[in-house]
Each structure stands twice: as C-alpha cells, then as structure tokens.
Amino acid sequence: ADLATACHKQGISLHLYYSHLDWHRLDYPLGRTGLKLGRPTDKQNYDEYFKFMNRQLTELLTNYGPVDCIWFDGWWDHDSDAKPFDWRLDEQYRLIHQLQPQCLVANNHHQSPYAGEDIQIFERDVPGENKAGLSGQEVSQLPLETCQTMNDTWGYNITDKNYKSADEIVRLLVSTAG
C-alpha cells in the first residue's frame, strides 16, 4: 500500500510485475524450469492455481487505486510442453480489464501478442533481431518494449561487473522504438 500511495502522490504510474510461474505453490503445474525441484507432482492442479492467481490479481487491482500496467512473466516455463499449455489468458485479461479498464497488459511470453495485450515485449533483444533466440515473433503494431539487464544477470550478483555502456543502452532503446 505504501508504494501505491507514494506513486499516486508523486504522479508516477504504478506498474506491477506478476509471475505466472510459481515454484512454491504445490498446485502450480511444473514446467521445464521446476522439474528438478524434487516437488511432488500429485498436487498439481491448474484450475486451483488459476483461481489463486485471479484472487491475487483482484486484490492488486482493487486495493491499491489505479494500476497502469500488469507485466506478466514466467509463461515461457511451459513453452516446450508436448501439448500447448492453456494459460487461459483471455479469462485473466478480461478480469483485469473489468477491474481496471485503463490497465495495460504486457506478457513476456516470447510469442506474438495475444488478444487483450497492449505491449509487445522482446526479451534481451530488439524487434526484428532475435540475437538471443527468444524473440523470433513478428513485430506487431502495438507499442514495443525491450526487456534488458544492465549487466549479465536479472538479479543482484556481487561479481557481475559487466555493465552495458551508455551507448549500448541508448542503441537498445532507439532500436526498440524504431
């Protein structure tokens, strides 16, 4: 609540990160990244996990004032499943837009945008290049985003000193903007 209050007070739009992937909850159906966790697989139940996610999203979208964007991640955990995994995004996006019609939806799923999404994301890449092998989808007419690290890791790593130069960061931004 403090973050939302401070953002609203300062006129800063509130964007929230939400991971579809959850290695902690037993009802999350493990994808390729969680198969070696040693967790039991008999409790996996996407219907229950989907209800849990939507309860969380409802809380986030009703208790903290205007939310300008939900940025999803982790969908790629099931990108190598033999049968395509149905995340039921249409239902989830409908819920978001019912609760906050102005809220943008972005999903870092490495696919072409789905109905209900407002931003196309290119992870560790710029539109049309696919150097990282994660962004081979066609470039849409939606606003574009490049999802980058400032060095080589997503989280804090005391030994990672390989920071991008200011020129490289500007090149990434300009290349994404077109």
Sequence positions of predicted segments:
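Mature catalytic domains of secreted/periplasmic carbohydrate-active enzymes
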Residues: 1-178
